[in-house]
Amino acid sequence: MKDPSREIIQVNIEEELKSSYLDYSMSVIVGRALPDVRDGLKPVHRRILFAMYILNNDWNKAYKKSARIVGDVIGKYHPHGDSAVYDAIVRMAQKFSLRYMLIDGQGNFGSVDGDSAAAMRYTEVRMSKIAHELLNDLEKNTVEFLPNYDGTEYIPEILPAKIPNLLINGSSGIAVGMATNIPPHNLNEVINGCLAYIDNNDITLEELIKHIPGPDFPTAAIINGKSGIEEAYRTGKGKIYIRAQNQIEKNKKNKKESIVFNEIPYQVNKSRLIEKIAELVKEKRIDGITALRDESDKDGMRIVIEIKREAIAEVILNQLYSLTQLQISFGINMVALCQGQPKTLSLKEILKNFLSHRQEIIIRRSLFELNKVRNRIHILEGLNMALININAIIEIIKNSVNSIDAKKIIIQKNWKSEKINYLAKKHEYYFSEKQAQAILDLRLHKITNLEQEKIIMEHNDLIKKTKELKEILENPKKMFEVIKSELLSIQNNFSDKRRTKITENHSDINMEDLINQEDVVVTLSHSGYVKYQPLSDYNAQRRGGKGKSAAKIKEEDFIESLVIANTHDTILCFSSRGILYWMKVYQLPESSRHARGRPIVNLLPLSPKERITAILPVHKYQDNLNIFMTTAHGIVKKSSLSQFKKPRFAGIIAINLHANDELIGVALTDGNNNIMLFTQNGKVVQFLENSVRTMGRTASGVKGIKIKKNDKVVSLIVPKNKGSILIATKNGYGKRTKISDFPIKSRATQGVISIKITKKNGKIIGAIQVIEKDQIMMITDAGTLVRIRVSEVGVLKRNTQGVILIRTSKNEKVVALQKIVDPMIEKIDL
């Protein structure tokens, strides 16, 4: 008896997992999820069409039960699940799924509302007329055949595919580690593109797009903008926006308007779409809609949305596009199997591979036909020679014992003829076995003069056919003429008009049109929680008040930055690494005073140790403005605002920082300002902005102030002609000092005293420029906010410690200071 332990093979589990998972991945990629670039089909679709081909389930013959096709595919070619095969059949029979249906279905095959197809035992199918163009010439040895799972049947590795199916019907699928999503196109346009590529292999993408302007979906609708199309055609990846086709109708009786949709984006479920619109109306997220009806019937789609008389149709339309699937993004990812390997393909590469496939098919077909023609010519030569010597042939047959004896004599005899010199060299001719058999099979009526002429005519025609086939094989130009001829024939038989319209430029839904303009308080906590809330939530209080809670935060967290902005403003977010990110204020979470907000790392692509240290609201980009930056180590830098005009999701470098330094302040300047830098230990330096040259984004900057040990810059101020500087400290103290009290010094000096620092008032947390009518906000690390009129804060000399601005609790410290300017004061309740 064998010892089982001796038959166990020890393997490294890590290597086994790698190997097994790789095998599984390639099996899914090659054998299931991705289409082949040559015929545009996945294996299951290829097996279905081949099964129908073998069954003669042709477009002009009777329908067959879907279950019969499913059974043949599973039993003969591959043991799929029956539902997987039937689902593939259903999709190929849905006019809203495929631009050019490959299966003609009879029965219930589902709907655009998401209704399921009837069971396979009820529905019937046959190949569509255009599907035959995928299978034509299959019997002419044009492709390789592979054995099925048990070796009892053979199935084509690929279909001959006269039509560029990958482009005209598209494909989608998810493999392991990759996916494909190729949109459908118009057959007429794709063939025009193929013809243009044949005429000029070096055709540019711009010229190619004149023939193939973009996808053409079975559900029509509108492609919003061309830029995504061009990117996808160039690189194989891109994103387009598909928008529902609409029209605004006016009721003649009540003068009310209705928005009517006749076409919706590709693969959108109409029933769920209508439910979503109704839900938005119920939740009052869309206002102005009075009625919603689905009036679709056999003649076409029609979704009617009635709106209030005073409502603006364009505004509601924008809201619908923004909040529902009446506008969707379609991510194009043109991945297909190319020579058995998954590859992302450009439009030109897809056309090139399809036409290369057609070349190979025509070569194999021509060789097959040439061999067949030569065999037939060989037989005709024998028949022709036999008819010339018919009397001798008949005599041999009469005198032979049997057909075998007659064949042997005919083959061995040397036949002479002076009439047909091209058949016999030196007037000698020997019949082959095949010729001899054909002579014996010859019917008597074939020896008439008329039949002899027919044989000679057929022989001559086949000689011409041989020359044509040889020319196709030897002359690439002739071969491409054949390809073009076949493509033109398909174009004449199957082309139709484009359904999907394409707009010239992408028309983004302007979210700002849907957002009310209002002044808000934007806060950023030390732990990175960001939010905004209406400025009107806060009423002005007298100096020394306890204030309102600005944010509910954890004990270890506190508010670090606060700015006043408009909901339509852009927030420039400067990180500790000197990277600049962009956000619109309305993209931030709107929260109540008691809410924490949302982690900014969920809104911006920050690295693990990166945090936002400064935020700056920008209302409008102006070419004559600069961004002036300062770091905690006293380094300053000036860059043109225009360098930061184009947002990038990943952010851009704003300043190159030295080790252990961070960006703490930013300001907008015009190039002729004064600059003031305040340190936490009570120092300030004021210098001319023009002493700092304008630098590129990646520059490191120059020294702005000399920093002593344990000191750092906390505030950057660009002072105006009038007003004073309000300084606040950690323990709630503060004061105002006239700007004129701060002397202008040279850049990179130590500066002068700005406030007298004591244990009582604490170190400086911030400094701002104010005027008499201003108000300020102060926030503590406990999240308490107090709003104070500047007029209530006394004006003191530089070398003083200030007065109490906010009474803090034990261990509570002031962490942020922000000004509210006069125009905002007029809008709030004092």
From Swiss-Prot:
Motif stretch (GyrA-box): 541-547
Main location (coarse class): cytoplasm
Biological process according to GO: DNA topological change; DNA-templated DNA replication
Domain (Topo IIA-type catalytic): residue spans on this chain: 34-514
Subcellular location per the Swiss-Prot or TrEMBL entry: Cytoplasm
SMART domains for the chain: TOP4c
Name listed for the protein in its UniProt record: DNA gyrase subunit A
Primary gene name: gyrA
